């Protein structure tokens, strides 16, 4: 009976450990899939906001206090064959939305810039058909 109890205890511990590893794996891969900001906006720009674009990538909004400009770049999680990508960036206090980048890209779209010191910005777009949209953010 002692051997049976010991075998059951080992099986329970092994099963719990395997279940814990399996439960942790999806979270670990989801975190690992988020791509880091690539510095495409240039020196002096710091990330002030970001949003995941489904499982396709991440859009990063950056700001330079020296220039008063915001910059937007969308980066794919996995670079590869070109896919359609479009990003827009505008001041929230205007109806003019002519600052954009659009094309088929292997790794990222942008950077695009708008002078927005003292006002909010709107930024939106898509990566391979998956849309993101942020309105009236990062005011100031």
Predicted feature locations:
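N-terminal prepro-regions of secreted/extracellular proteins
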Residues: 1-46
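Post-signal peptide N-terminal regions of Sec-secreted extracellular proteins
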Residues: 29-140
């Amino acid at each position: 009976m002692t051997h049976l109890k010991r075998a059951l205890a080992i099986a329970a511990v092994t099963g719990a450990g395997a279940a814990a590893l399996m439960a942790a794996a999806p979270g670990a891969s989801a975190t690992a899939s988020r791509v880091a900001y690539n510095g495409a906006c240039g020196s002096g720009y710091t990330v002030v906001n970001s949003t995941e674009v489904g499982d396709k990538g991440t859009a990063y909004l950056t700001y330079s206090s020296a220039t008063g400009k915001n910059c937007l770049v969308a980066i794919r999680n996995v670079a590869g064959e070109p896919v359609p990508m479009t990003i827009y960036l505008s001041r929230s206090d205007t109806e003019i939305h002519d600052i954009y980048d659009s094309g088929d890209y292997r790794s990222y779209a942008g950077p695009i810039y708008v002078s927005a010191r003292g006002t909010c910005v709107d930024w939106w777009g898509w990566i391979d058909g998956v849309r993101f949209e942020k309105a009236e953010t990062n005011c100031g």
